[in-house]
Amino acid sequence: MPPSSKSRRLPPAASDSAASDAQKRRKNVGTACSACKARKLKCTGAPPCANCVKSRIECTLDETADRRRRGVLKRKIDKLEDQEDLLGRLLEFFREGNNRCTIPLLNLIRSHASPPEIRFYIEHQLPLSKRTQTPELIEVCREIEQRHSFEPLPKRHILDTTPNGSHDTPRLSVPAQPWTSIITDDGLVSRLIFLWFTWVHPFCNFIDRDRFIRDMKSGSLSASYCSPLLVNIILSDACHSASGLPDDLTSKRIEFYEEAERLLDKEEGRISLPTAQGLGVLWMCASITGRDRQAWIKGTQLAYSLRELSQVSCNLPSEANRDATALATIVNSTNWGLFNVAMVHALFARKRPIIEPPAQPPSVSNQCDHGMWYSYPNKSTGVESHTSCLFTAACNLNRIAYNLGRFLFSQEKKSSARLDLTDGELDALRDLNEWADQLPVCLKESIADLPHVLSLHMYNHAILTVVYGFLRTRPLYLPNPSASTPTVRDALMSPARAWAASLSSARKIAHLTLVHRANWGSDRMPGATVHCIMAALFALLDSVDDPANRDAFISLTAAAAAFSRRWESPIALLRNIQNIARQRDVTLPPETGAFFLDPDQPSGNSTPIKSETPEGTAIS
């Protein structure tokens, strides 16, 4: 055989396309597709990759898993450009569109609706003639849903920013350990604790803030005013107040709650002040999140714990030391604070409160509380909190309301039986109407720089709404009309005036919610406020034809919808209103139609509320 026959034949020169493929294969790939990861193959990166094409399988590449700096920056730039383009297109739509299309959508957006809810409203609730005139809006909503399909954009970061991008820092520092095993970040725990004491605690005041923070800073598990149970459930509830949390911290909210329940079971019936307070927050969380059975169990445990603690405090020997005496005072304040919260829940449930009024009167300070309140996380200079003044006023209001139990907690329908009022009920009605006039200057309804003062007045008007709504349906016997104040006498003797007083208070609740939203946003209201909003909505339901009542109903529905983004309970209440409106053949304002839609159901299963053609009024 000639030598030439032994030489190997050279391969042909690579074509341009083959060279390009080879170059792609040699390119560094930051992350592989899911199929290549599962089969442990080298991936070419760009979907569809060569392996998936060869195997004829779907190629799925999660680009967010690529943690290289260039990839992260590129995704961030693309996201910002997409948001800028989306904002410009929405502004153009609102600028050029008429009120028939824009105002209901604007009201829905203001209620913190998610992109799928907005798209569902446009595709299934917006009249077909208007949808065909605004195809660009349909396209915008599709882009929104595509952008959010893998990574939802948070509505608001935990550190909300002001227009100039500044934010405040928490004015306390507490350790995560040894109080919680869920997270170890002291800074995040401090922010959540301060957030809860900023927005929830002033109105739901049954924890001594200063002693709790002092003991939490100490890190001692034998502390008298702090415990892991109490810390974990406060952290869980604080996550509800911090809307727009990242997904990982949203899951931590559930873990905090489950950890608190585990720690409660570990107590095995032992009762202490932090345990009772932790039960109080657990009960609040279970109620607002729709866990009715858990709420009933926690409420029963809470009532028993408070009775046991109160008996121990009342039986202190006269030679008890200062710490024991201080603890007894704080137990009494805790009892009153939880009674106040129980009355708010009982008002809407129309049931007697699970906690009876404490036997000992609340401790009253003759000096105004000069502690400062800051609208964290937004930067603010701070205003005097007046927390102790508000606590005293709330206790006085609930003592009055408790004496009107027949009005507040009755579940009877309209009755023709004559209603005989006792002297105690007449006195309570007089005190209820005079309560607001006797408040100190720092708690007047015109004070709009403290959200908890607004919540207090919402609650007062909710009581008035329910009481006068009850009186309008029952004939009364008033043996001595001159003994009553003019307002009470007119309401008692004229059902029409009683109903007018009820609607007036409902409209005032709507006004206060607008003030709160303008100053701090709807998603900063404490969960207990939703009961006041729902009481006003049910009162206004039969009178939405009146323009003033109509506007109030729209703003209250938007506020309730904002609550439903954070908790489950308002969702069921809104559906209840929707069903009652259908049963009574009530035509609801069309501006509220979007708030009652369920975006998880297809359009064929949704039953729209009867409404007239909207000219619309935006929620200002």
From Swiss-Prot:
Applied biotechnology uses: Notoamides have been shown to exhibit antitumoral activities. Notoamides A-C show moderate cytotoxicity against HeLa and L1210 cells with IC(50) values in the range of 22-52 mg/ml, but the IC(50) value of notoamide D is greater than 100 mg/ml. Moreover, notoamide C induces G2/M-cell cycle arrest at a concentration of 6.3 mg/ml.
Biological processes per GO annotation: DNA-templated transcription
InterPro entries linked to this entry: Notoamide_regulator, Transcription_factor_dom_fun, Zn2-C6_fun-type_DNA-bd_sf, Zn2Cys6_DnaBD
Coiled-coil features, chain-numbered ranges: none
GO cellular component, one term: nucleus
DNA-binding region range list: 33-59
Disulfide-linked positions: none
SMART domains listed in its UniProt record: GAL4
Subcellular location: Nucleus
UniProt region (Disordered), positions on chain: 1-26, 591-620
One annotated GO molecular function: zinc ion binding
UniProt keyword terms in alphabetical order: DNA-binding, Metal-binding, Nucleus, Transcription, Transcription regulation, Zinc
Superkingdom of this protein's organism: Eukaryota
Function: Transcription factor that probably regulates the expression of the gene cluster that mediates the biosynthesis of notoamide, a fungal indole alkaloid that belongs to a family of natural products containing a characteristic bicyclo[2.2.2]diazaoctane core.
PANTHER family: ZN(II)2CYS6 TRANSCRIPTION FACTOR (EUROFUNG), ZN(II)2CYS6 TRANSCRIPTION FACTOR (EUROFUNG)-RELATED
Protein name from the UniProt record: Notoamide biosynthesis transcriptional activator notL'
Species the sequence originates in: Aspergillus versicolor
High-level lineage: Eukaryota, Fungi, Dikarya, Ascomycota, Pezizomycotina
